[in-house]
């Protein structure tokens, strides 16, 4: 038998598959088909998910393991901050370690166990890097600028300013009013910039942020390859960096920032060290279900409730209790 774990960070949900425990690793095509099968919100297992997190042997010296991120549409993301926290917890428990590095597509990133947010709400801190601002890194074009940092971009939305940051996933960020973050614009701009458009040829994650107060934000994200998600760890990290750079009177380097999102909350700390930016992302790493399945069913992307054994952990109830009194927005325009 093989194992899957249903997990979430700020209710950005995933299945974890540890390929090092399989007799035969899945091919890239099999991983893509499995991700599309498991994560479908209509027909997938346990109501679907936002992606599949694949654990492999490390590819760089000094790392404990490698994490790959397969989106719900079968595309591969270079990183996932919320997913990395859950993989960090899995590896910490698998190998009995508290601090270590995990390989991602672009870098080996430091992770560590943190104090629980609440009873049965375990938390992990993960490094989010590298950071790039140049248009080739995202990429974008035809916007009249080589970089966007609080820049008016009338081609996208005449009334807003935008920042573009690859961290390493590409993110477009705008600080907006509560009315705008609750309204339909993000649900229009996100699909447009992730379809055939003249500006972002590879698509882009689009983040709207509302400043609640000093060191307090609310962030809503339309994710490339997924759509609206409850939270996006790299999006929150990129938004926190833009917040410190553009709104220094409200947030500062090396100070904790509380970031609320539709799925809960996280904390970030923005750093500038050795002439490089990086962000520390701290949040929950919740396991909701353990799943036992025949390895052949993984290879054939035929996992369903009838051919696997599912055990709930009880951690979701603790998480829901934790977020019960957090600030909430009326996000009625969810697409």
Give residue spans per PLM region:
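A glycine-rich beta-to-alpha transition motif near the start of alpha/beta enzyme domains, typified by
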Residues: 1-121, 173-335
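Flexible, active-site-adjacent loop/turn segments at secondary-structure boundaries
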Residues: 136-138, 165, 204, 291
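Transmembrane helix-loop-helix hairpins in multi-pass inner-membrane proteins
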Residues: 123-125, 131
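Internal active-site segments that recognize and position negatively charged phosphoryl groups
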Residues: 151-182
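Active-site glycine-rich loop that binds ribose-phosphate moieties when present
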Residues: 133-135, 139-160
């Amino acid at each position: 038998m093989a194992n899957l774990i249903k997990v979430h960070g700020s209710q950005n949900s995933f299945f974890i598959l540890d390929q090092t425990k399989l007799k035969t690793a899945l091919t890239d095509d099999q991983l893509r088909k499995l991700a599309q099968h498991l994560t479908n919100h209509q027909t997938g297992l346990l109501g679907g998910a936002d992606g599949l997190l694949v654990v492999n042997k490390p590819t760089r010296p000094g790392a404990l393991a490698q994490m790959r991120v397969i989106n719900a549409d079968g595309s591969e993301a270079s990183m996932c901050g919320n997913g990395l926290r859950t993989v960090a917890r899995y590896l910490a428990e698998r190998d009995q370690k508290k601090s270590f590095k995990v390989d991602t597509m672009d870098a080996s990133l430091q992770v560590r166990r943190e104090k629980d947010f609440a009873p049965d709400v375990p938390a992990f801190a993960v490094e989010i890097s590298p950071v790039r601002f140049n248009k080739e890194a995202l990429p974008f074009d035809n916007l009249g600028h080589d970089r966007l940092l609080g820049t008016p971009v009338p081609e996208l939305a005449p009334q807003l300013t935008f920042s573009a940051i690859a961290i390493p996933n590409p993110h477009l960020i705008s600080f907006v009013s509560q009315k705008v973050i609750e309204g339909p614009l993000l649900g229009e701009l996100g699909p447009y910039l992730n379809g055939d458009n003249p500006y972002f040829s590879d698509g882009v994650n689009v983040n709207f942020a509302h400043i609640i107060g000093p060191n307090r934000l609310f962030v809503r994200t339309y994710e490339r390859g997924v759509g609206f998600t409850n939270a996006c760890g790299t999006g929150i990290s990129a938004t926190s960096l833009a917040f410190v750079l553009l709104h220094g009177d409200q947030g500062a380097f090396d100070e904790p920032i509380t970031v609320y999102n539709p799925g809960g909350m996280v904390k970030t700390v923005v750093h500038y060290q050795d002439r490089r930016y990086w962000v520390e992302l701290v949040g929950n790493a919740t396991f909701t279900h353990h799943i036992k399945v025949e390895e052949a069913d993984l290879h054939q992307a035929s996992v369903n409730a009838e051919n696997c054994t599912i055990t709930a952990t009880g951690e979701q109830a603790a998480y829901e209790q934790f977020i019960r009194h957090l600030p909430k927005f009326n996000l009625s325009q969810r697409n």
